[in-house]
Amino acid sequence: AEVTRFMSDEEKKKVVDYMEAGRRYLGQMDLNIKSPLVWEFYDNTLKTLAGYGAKIVRLDAFAYAPKEPGEKNFLNEPGTWDLLEKVRKLADKYNLTLLPEIHASYGEKNYEQIAGKGYMTYDFFLPGLIIDALESGDGKHLFDWAKELIEKDIHTVNMLGCHDGIPLLDLKGLLSEERIQNLIDTVVGRGGYVKDLHGQKNMYYQVNATYYSALGEDDAKMLLARALQLFMPGKPQIWYLD
């Protein structure tokens, strides 16, 4: 940091280019779930997390794990559920609760599948529903969602913002396309950036913005949004960059 104080932007760029030359990035790595070594790794990881005091463990993008040639390789059945059950047996040894993470449209009802098998699920619908309600002045969809969670006894972890941004894909089938587009236009107009579904153009996935920015940096709206989150069914997750 001290050195860069005396460097021009062009000089800094040359240093970065030099450091990055020839570097290759692996990205997210698939693990061979058929290997005993991988399951030994999973067991050790869960044991370590429990030793640090963890109670709930998020399984990031778990639905992509079981892959087979010729399959869609997203939520393959029964492979996905068999894998999840195998991980749960490991987690039970250490008194850990699993939180499977999955993004899919409301209409696909994957959240019901997860809940029906006895797992907690992320409420990725709530962030968009609150923005829709506050900006449109119509809270019916938010009310109906809260009612559904209670009536179907779905146990969730909810949030406003998160490191993935504000979910959009999840809202398909819950809000009309017009209302989703209005939400997108509102947040983008306040500095947000829409990320499309991987490999597809013009298929919205999420909008990147802090929740405070998405609400127009309005303190009253942010306070109300947080109150709604805290009193919704489910465990509230407070993200430090909301």
Per-region residue spans from a language model:
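Active-site and adjacent substrate-binding regions of carbohydrate-active enzymes
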Residues: 1-242
